[in-house]
Regions:
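Short structural boundary motif marking the start of a folded domain
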Residues: 1-7
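Adenosine-nucleotide cofactor-binding segment
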Residues: 177-178, 183, 196-245
Length: 245
């Protein structure tokens, strides 16, 4: 039996760091360690809403869940059902948004034995059935933890669209060598968005990034300068009027 130390949610603003034994792994489950888990404001929202959050079970006060959904680690043991696909010693990441057809359950929100804020977890069958346990071959664990937030950035870029003149067709994604504006873009997710705009498959000719914090703007300006294909302008929101933009 594997012992774990985890941060568990019992209700609104009721988080407890506890050490306890995980149950025996079933044949359709996977036992894994967690090495890194990055912080997400979605977890802050979850902790504040507790049982009122749509992904948190109503009985969380008596059946707590482990929070954290941006995690990366090592597979320790694999149940018989999944031994054809996963092996002990593999690194993994989880796509936490399972998109189950009948309920909103997700790791880090809904399950008692899996979440990023833990030393060891049991990954339930639903994660593998939804093809949301991914073998990870990156160089560092922390980069694995960034897979989930980066997927959100990519989704946002892909959700942009432009109308084609003279038709009702929607062209999805940002416009190649067009103009892109990122508002409030020097926080963690904003920096990921800047990085993706510069180094992703489609690059704008001009990228404008605004924020209200001069220190953050200076940090972004230093670490993400213009590239040959993309000119970047960093602007304080007070200076980013209609005429300027």
């Amino acid at each position: 039996m594997q012992t774990t130390t985890a941060l568990r949610l019992y209700g609104k603003r009721d988080l407890r760091l506890e050490t306890f034994d995980l149950p025996e792994m079933r044949d359709d489950e996977i036992l894994a360690s967690v090495v890194t888990d990055s912080l997400c404001l979605s977890s802050w929202k979850e902790a504040n809403q507790g049982e009122n959050h749509k992904k948190v079970p109503d009985d969380v006060a008596t059946n707590p869940i482990i929070i954290g959904h941006e995690f990366c680690g090592d597979i320790i043991a694999v149940g018989k059902k999944w031994q054809h696909k996963f092996q002990p010693g593999q690194r993994y990441v989880i796509q936490a948004n399972l998109q189950l057809p009948d309920r909103p359950d997700c790791p880090g929100y809904s399950f008692p034995w899996v979440g990023g804020e833990a030393t060891h977890v049991i990954i339930p069958d639903e994660v593998m059935e939804q093809d949301c346990l991914l073998a990870y071959e990156g160089e560092t664990y922390f980069e694995g933890s960034l897979v989930e937030p980066l997927s959100c950035v990519i989704g946002a870029f892909n959700a942009n669209y432009h109308l084609q003149e003279g038709s009702y067709n929607h062209k999805m994604g940002i416009r190649p060598q067009g103009h892109t504006l990122i508002l409030g873009g020097t926080g963690p997710m904003g920096l990921l968005a800047i990085d993706y705009a510069l180094h992703g498959p489609v690059n704008p000719a001009m990228l404008v990034v605004t924020d209200t914090n001069n220190d953050k703007l200076s940090y972004a300006r230093k670490h993400y300068p213009s590239e040959p294909q993309t000119l970047i302008h960093y602007l304080h929101a007070q200076d980013a009027g209609y005429d300027t933009l």
